[in-house]
Each structure stands twice: as C-alpha cells, then as structure tokens.
Amino acid sequence: MDLSNRRNPLRDLSFPPPPPPPIFHRASSTGTSFPILAVAVIGILATAFLLVSYYVFVIKCCLNWHRIDILGRFSLSRRRRNDQDPLMVYSPELRSRGLDESVIRAIPIFKFKKRYDQNDGVFTGEGEEEEEKRSQECSVCLSEFQDEEKLRIIPNCSHLFHIDCIDVWLQNNANCPLCRTRVSCDTSFPPDRVSAPSTSPENLVMLRGENEYVVIELGSSIGSDRDSPRHGRLLTGQERSNSGYLLNENTQNSISPSPKKLDRGGLPRKFRKLHKMTSMGDECIDIRRGKDEQFGSIQPIRRSISMDSSADRQLYLAVQEAIRKNREVLVVGDGGGCSSSSGNVSNSKVKRSFFSFGSSRRSRSSSKLPLYFEP
C-alpha cells in the first residue's frame, strides 16, 4: 500500500465559515433599554403617590380620632355634671349678658348739635380740652361726632355714642363702655321722688332746644285735676318758652338758685360751649296759702342736696327759710291774725320743670337732686 496515496482524514474535514458580524446590534440594545426606563419612572411615581395618599389618610384619621376623643371627654364631663345636679336648668344669661332688643331700642336718640362760640370763633364743646374732645367722639369707634348726627345717650351716665356702635356693644354687655355704669331705661319716677337738675331759671330761657320737658305741679286744691298732687303735663311751644319766667310770676316766697352760676355777659360759660340737650331746667318752689284752705294742707318739703355745690347749699337753706316763715304764718293764723301778704295768693304749689333726660358730663354741674314730699 502506498502511503502517499492515502489521504489525511483531518485534511478532508471542512469547517463552516464564520458568521458575518451583526449589523443591527446597537439599535436592538437601545430599543430594549427604553421600555425599562419608562417602567421604572412610572413605578417610582406610583409609589410616591401611594405614599402621599397613605400619609394623608393617616393624618385625617388622627385628627378625627382626636376630635372624637375631645367630644367624648366633653360629653362625659357634662354627664357627670348632670348626674351631680340633675335639677340644673340652663340659663340664657350665662351665654349672653347683654340687653334685650326692646331695652336697647328704648334708649333715647337725639341729634347732635354744635354751638358756635363767639369768643373763640370755633366750634367747641363743654368742659376742659380733654373733656371737650371726649364729649365730641364715640368711645367705641373713636370717631368724632358730626353736626346733626343722630346719637344715643345713656340715661344713667349721659354719655354719647353712635347708634350702631352702642347697639352692638349692648347686645353683649349691659354697661356703659366708657364708665361701666349699668344701663337701664327706667325713666318712670317714683311717686314721692322727683329727680331734678340744679340749674337756675335764667338758663332755661337762654336755651332754644326743641325738646319737651315736664312740669310737675303739686297742690292741695280740691276738685281740680290739674292741680292735684303728683300731676304732670307736657309743655311745648309758647308754654315752654314762657316757663322760664315762673319765678317772676310768683310774687311770694319764691326761691331760685344763686346767680353765681352765670358768667360775665349774663350767659353761662357752659352754654356758650357745645349744647347737647343737657339736663337743665328752671327751679321754682312756691309755698302759698289761700283764705279758704285749711292750715294743715300745706306740705313741708325736704330736699337732699349734694354738698359739692355751694349754690345748691344756698338753695337748700333758702327752702328751709321759706318753710320756717310759712310755719310762722300758720301760727299767726291759729291765733286769729293773718298777714296781709298771705291773702293775695290762691293755693300751695310746688312747680318744677326739667328736661326728660340729662347729659352733663361733669359730675358737679350735672348733679341730680332728689325732691322728697312729706305728708
């Protein structure tokens, strides 16, 4: 056998050619990575949303449980109070300490007027500078009063406020916002007590207000309703202007306050200032006896005077002097004699005119003097 003719089996084996390099390898890797990134972002956002929702839900639940706990404690404490005092009744005064709507509407309203001062040449108010500023502004809203503006005046302390301001205040409070005086609208007078200001009769003639005031006549005439005791009537118009001369018409035992209140020029200083419908009126006490009247019909008068006013003290002494003289006349009448002056008069009267409400801000000038009548 020839060895050269033999074929090598290793040579006869043929190897396949190598595969060609991939052309789209980079494009396929980019396309597979994009969906993975999108899924990852969406998953992160969904997880964040779920976490936020969970935290919101937990916070709301905690707040609700806290409220429920507070309400439960409140109801439990309320039940305990009810068990301790089962007869306890709820009072609306505990909730609101203000005044009723009817009482608030009963507080008087008037128009604010400024008076021109010829000496100063400006519009001014009563009192000193601080008192003038306080009397011209509302202490609730701190705004100044305008001329012809409607205001409310507290009857007890005579302080002025805007209608809206004081109405809102009195709905929650029952006192004056300036002096803390309790507000009440009881304007009725007791049968044996008349509240009257201390002002001379001349001052009333100088005032030209449109307010009505009351004249109370106390007399002992029989069969006359007009002169019956404790009888009051309203005067307007001409009667109001003429009522300032009650002192001049009475010719006997007439008593008036001291003229020291009048300033130079015959006009009081406080009336040249701001005029606010103040509590001013004339005083005239006339004690007279008629021929046909019994001697026991004359009523003695006792009047309490505030000791901070010298003029009021003088008026009190003058009243006591008139009563003493009248008693002397009675003693002479019992003995058979009668003075000539006592026969010129007709009856026993006590006249007093005053405004329906007062508003002087100064305590000394606005002291109200009660008048007592003894049988």
Curated annotation (Swiss-Prot):
What is the first-listed, main subcellular location in coarse terms?
membrane
- What is this protein called in UniProt? RING-H2 finger protein ATL16
Residue spans annotated as Zn fingers (RING-type) read 138-180
Q: What is its EC number?
A: 2.3.2.27
Q: Where is this region: Disordered?
A: 1-20, 223-266, 356-375
Similarity comment: family membership: Belongs to the RING-type zinc finger family. ATL subfamily.
Q: What is known of its domains?
A: The RING-type zinc finger domain mediates binding to an E2 ubiquitin-conjugating enzyme.
